[in-house]
Amino acid sequence: METIQAIRSRRSVRKYQQRLVPHEVIEQIVADAAYAPSWKNTQIARYVLVEDRTTIDKMAEEMVLDFKLNEKRLKNCPAVMVLTYVTGRSGYERDGSFSTPKEAGFEMFDAGIAAQTFCLAAWERGVGTVITGYFDEEKITRLLNLPENQKVGCVIGLCSPDEEPAAPKRKSVEDLLTYK
């Protein structure tokens, strides 16, 4: 698949086949996602694969902050990838001071780049994804026993797509681009 084709064809997949993605495919996707750019090559993204049905159901029922649509999507998903990021590195100098006025905001920026790279690599391999950003971070952190220096960036549903969603309408270049 060519890069532009992947960018233009990748969709959030919300209808899944109930089969797990093989671990070797997941490992290939993570290996590709490791090439996502990051602040000073800090590579702060980490990946936690959750396949245990009880854990996924608990995440869906208790950790999507009463957003029923996400609860339903997560409950139906055969596996989820929790993308976390190591804190205190991206946007920081070695002495702990900030390198930029954006301060710790670069952590989520780098996590977002990693999430997009992960999703494009998954799509290349026929794996559907849907990114969820609305969740109870503290509960997920406790449930998955994440290290103290990691925060949850997003939760990504992983699946074999049951159908290929139609492309939503996109804004025109004229709406998006300004020349000065």
Residue ranges and their predicted role:
Residues 13-28:
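A short N-terminal beta-strand-loop micro-motif at the entrance of redox/enzyme domains
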